[in-house]
From Swiss-Prot:
<feature type="binding site">
    <location>
        <position position="112"/>
    </location>
    <ligand>
        <name>ATP</name>
    </ligand>
</feature>
<protein>
    <recommendedName>
        <fullName>Nucleoside diphosphate kinase</fullName>
        <ecNumber>2.7.4.6</ecNumber>
    </recommendedName>
</protein>
<keyword id="KW-0546">Nucleotide metabolism</keyword>
<keyword id="KW-0460">Magnesium</keyword>
<keyword id="KW-0418">Kinase</keyword>
<keyword id="KW-0479">Metal-binding</keyword>
<keyword id="KW-0808">Transferase</keyword>
<keyword id="KW-0067">ATP-binding</keyword>
<feature type="active site" description="Pros-phosphohistidine intermediate">
    <location>
        <position position="115"/>
    </location>
</feature>
<keyword id="KW-0597">Phosphoprotein</keyword>
<dbReference type="GO" id="GO:0004550">
    <property type="term" value="F:nucleoside diphosphate kinase activity"/>
</dbReference>
<dbReference type="InterPro" id="IPR023005">
    <property type="entry name" value="Nucleoside_diP_kinase_AS"/>
</dbReference>
<dbReference type="GO" id="GO:0005737">
    <property type="term" value="C:cytoplasm"/>
</dbReference>
<feature type="binding site">
    <location>
        <position position="9"/>
    </location>
    <ligand>
        <name>ATP</name>
    </ligand>
</feature>
<dbReference type="InterPro" id="IPR001564">
    <property type="entry name" value="Nucleoside_diP_kinase"/>
</dbReference>
<feature type="binding site">
    <location>
        <position position="85"/>
    </location>
    <ligand>
        <name>ATP</name>
    </ligand>
</feature>
<dbReference type="GO" id="GO:0046872">
    <property type="term" value="F:metal ion binding"/>
</dbReference>
Length: 149
């Protein structure tokens, strides 16, 4: 079972979109193996987005993700990374298709509601940054036999 990291960013929390986003994830057959709401520290935000540290928007990105509570999740499922990227839609909401989280719920690139890991390596790194292994609960869903061959 593949794991990925997903975060509902502070704009999604403030706009009361957490339930909508969790519902979309679960309806797609993915499992929520861990979930936490907290305000990300500046150190954690800088580590999380370190690949963008030389970009001009880095400071505002760190300020934004530390500006209020966010919801961090570990999501499990077959092809979880690829599926979550598809559910989220394009990073820029203007380019995101209707039916995706960003296409339906986000309006601005800087406030695009949700983050998901883009590769197995980043998923492992991001999960490890935000969760201890003991906090992650793998479990069989009652509908697994109807979802997977």
């Amino acid at each position: 079972m593949e794991r990925t990291y997903v975060m509902v960013k502070p704009d999604g929390v403030q706009r009361c979109l957490v339930g909508e986003i969790v519902s979309r994830i679960e309806k797609k057959g993915l499992k929520i193996a861990a979930l936490r709401m907290n305000v990300m520290t500046e150190a954690a935000a800088k580590e999380h987005y370190k690949e963008h540290s030389e970009r001009p928007f880095f400071g505002s990105l760190v300020s934004f993700v530390t500006s209020g509570p966010s919801v961090s999740m570990v999501i499990e499922g077959n092809n979880a990374i690829k599926i979550m990227r598809a559910i989220n839609g394009a990073t820029n909401p203007v380019d995101a298709l209707p039916g995706t989280i960003r296409g339906d719920l986000a309006v601005d690139m800087g406030r695009n509601v949700v983050h998901a890991s883009d590769a197995p390596e980043s998923a492992e790194r991001e999960i490890g940054l935000h969760f201890e292994e003991s906090e992650i609960s793998g479990y069989p869903r009652a509908d697994d036999e109807w979802l997977y061959e």
